[in-house]
Amino acid sequence: MKRRNADCSKLRRPLKRNRITEGIYGSTFLYLKFLVVWALVLLADFVLEFRFEYLWPFWLFIRSVYDSFRYQGLAFSVFFVCVAFTSNIICLLFIPIQWLFFAASTYVWVQYVWHTERGVCLPTVSLWILFVYIEAAIRFKDLKNFHVDLCRPFAAHCIGYPVVTLGFGFKSYVSYKMRLRKQKEVQKENEFYMQLLQQALPPEQQMLQKQEKEAEEAAKGLPDMDSSILIHHNGGIPANKKLSTALPEIEYREKGKEKDKDAKKHNLGINNNNILQPVDSKIQEIEYMENHINSKRLNNDLVGSTENLLKEDSCTASSKNYKNASGVVNSSPRSHSATNGSIPSSSSKNEKKQRCTSKGPSAHKDLMENCIPNNQLSKPDALVRLEQDIKKLKADLQASRQVEQELRSQISSLSSTERGIRSEMGQLRQENELLQNKLHNAVQMKQKDKQNISQLEKRLKAEQEARGFVEKQLMEEKKRKKLEEATAARAVAFAAASRGECTETLRSRIRELEAEGKKLTMDLKVKEEQIRELELKVQELRKYKENEKDTEVLMSALSAMQDKTQHLENSLSAETRIKLDLFSALGDAKRQLEIAQGQILQKDQEIKDLKQKIAEVMAVMPSITYSAATSPLSPVSPHYSSKFVETSPSGLDPNASVYQPLKK
């Protein structure tokens, strides 16, 4: 016959099977198998008077104990056995016998059908109803035919063991949920601190990060940004507060398609606004104090210049115009500083300068020359001291700002190092887990090999003993054979001499002995081959013992990795302590800023009080006349006139030559 090679490219297609008929036949066969098994078990129960279905949960319990001992250790397996034993005792003592047998049998059969591939469907439900009906109608009442005392512990185990497994499942579910909750809390805290550290960075770095994010999103094809951000890039937004409020809105719009992350991102945006609002308010307050101080200085200069201008225009203008001018000068910087917190605009200064120049440049210069020393003479020493204190406070404020910027840079560097350390920690943990898995597998293989070695050594000893026993038997058989041959020769000689009757029996005996000798030699050869195979296996196992040194190297590497992880954890804890110290220093700097701002407000209040006192003193002083020798062009006018003073309810006469108190 010729051998034909099959062509793989021209294989025949298998016949198509109808899935509907296959499913029907498979399901019917499966449920028929269930019914046959159930009927056989019931028949065995009735014949042997024992509930054999109770042995299945006991077998499951033994398997679970073996698995727990294999994977979780001896302590957990002992604990599991104790818990199962206590639950069995409770079910045995507190549940009535009939209900105990009914619940155990129904649970076993329902669980047996539940573990099929079909799951919950109409045939399984019908089988459950049949099992429950048979148990409740027939077997619930007939307990006299069974060995109740023998079956009762197994029935209690059929109920107690599932209760224990359900308890462990519930405990694992609760621990899983608690772990998830703890992870979410830690994630929220990390996001909060990360956002705080990002907001602590300088605005230039924030803008750079923002531009990089926008470039990445534009490259990915995300939707367009909000118009407010485009205006900010064009230079429309002057403040930092709009940036802080625009960031969460952008994140919310970009990630609005993901329904699960919507609420989380929105809450994070709100938290970011709440964090940024106090920082922006502090910055605005500092700017307001600086602008207020500058406005006060400008106000003092403008008061002196307006007094000179008003003296020049006293001959031509009425008192109302002077009052309006003074009111505008005095009120405009205050209103600007109170509402906007900014320095008065330079346009008002230019308008006032134009007014002064329109009335005569020479007269204005002379008036300014006369006015400057008078203002310098009228300023008290307290104002000079207050201005010096304000300068010192400004210097302290700038120093605190520099310290704050340095602290923020340190925080950003520490956060970057922390990220690197966390990534290294994750890598080291993964390597540690891999090494532990390798070590566990190596230990398991070592245990298995030890067991195999012990078994093979036992077999080798048994084979050696059998070999020695067979060799002894062979020697004895050889001796017997020699003796029998000698006796046979003698008998043959004797028989040949005397009679020839027993020759046939002796020949048959000799043949049987020869056959037995051949069998023994064959058995001896087989045993020798087995001994050789066992010796080869022993040599292989010895080689494996020599390879166990690699496991020791893995153990040393694992210990080194554990030491490294411990060192990294210690360094991470030290860095967290440094962060806490930096946060405390930042809080102290903010407190010093607040104290400086309070001192500036107190100094401003003292300046206002001193100005009021100066105004009262000027109102009480007598009118002083100046000689016309200084400037022949300017008319003689008093330094202070009653036209410039507003009508007050006091009874003092400012035109009197010498001040006289009122007579009551």
UniProtKB/Swiss-Prot annotation:
It comes from the Eukaryota. It comes from Rattus norvegicus (Rat). GO terms for biological process: brain development; chemotaxis; neuronal signal transduction. It is found in: Rough endoplasmic reticulum membrane; Nucleus membrane. It is a multi-pass membrane protein. Its main location: endoplasmic reticulum. Pfam families: Macoilin. GO terms for molecular function: microtubule binding. Residues 252-265 have a biased composition (Basic and acidic residues). Residues 320-348 have a biased composition (Polar residues). The chain crosses the membrane at residues 28-48, 75-95, 120-140, 154-174. Residues 252-274, 320-375, 630-664 are annotated as: Disordered. This is Macoilin. Belongs to the macoilin family. Glycans are attached at N324, N340, N452, N655. The lineage of its organism: Eukaryota, Metazoa, Chordata, Craniata, Vertebrata. The modification Phosphoserine is found at S305, S332, S631, S634. Keywords: Endoplasmic reticulum, Glycoprotein, Membrane, Nucleus, Phosphoprotein, Transmembrane, Transmembrane helix. Disulfide bonds: none annotated. One of its GO terms (cellular component) is axon. Plays a role in the regulation of neuronal activity.
